[in-house]
Amino acid sequence: AGAGKSTVAKAVAKKLGYIYIDTGAMYRAVTLYAIKKGFDPLDENKLSSALKDIDIKLDSEDHVYLNGEDVSHAIRENQISKLTSPVSAFPEVRKFLVAKQREFATAHNVIMDGRDIGTNVLPHAQIKIFMVATPECRAMRRVKEFQEKGENPVYESILQEIKDRDYRDSHRALNPMVKAEDAIELDTSNMNLEQGIEATTNLIKDKLEELK
């Protein structure tokens, strides 16, 4: 969260004419499903059993649909953000969504955004970029995002949530968040959004030239 990968990936996909896939949104949608159905998303057995009733679709306009309903805004609420990281560690949830992600990538030219794409979801992807930024920089970006929505988040709380999520995601038993050996690392700590988009676009174009 806050490294800028979603915003950058979305913009780069538009520039290159690729389809943008936000895998994090899919995990958020699963979390939201449990809340809508009135059960605890952290009840792993119940959530795993419910997966067969969940249909998630993404469109080229960045909308996310949960069983036909547009939940693009609902999945961005802070309550969902806090619960999604533990939910994404559940093996059955990961298997369910990874299968959907691979299916989509097979049929389209995509830029896929997520925390284990290059190592687990698409290990043979032509281009892998591992985007990083300091926790402090990421927390400031998240605070600005919430303020733009009219919310008043506490910087220290956001910073701690980011650090906790990083720890959980890099230490989970199934497909932890690590940089793929063949990934290019891009540190956006000292970049604004436009610079991040430009750097990423150039990396992709250079790599595509190499692959010709």
Question: Where are the regions a protein language model picked out?
Answer:
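Residue-level signal for inorganic ion chemistry
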Residues: 24, 68, 97, 111, ...
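Walker A/P-loop
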Residues: 6
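Small-molecule kinase domains that catalyze NTP-dependent phosphoryl transfer to phosphate-bearing small molecules
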Residues: 50, 101-108, 115, 119-120, ...
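Glycine-rich phosphate-binding loops of nucleotide-dependent enzymes
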Residues: 128-136, 142-145, 178, 185, ...
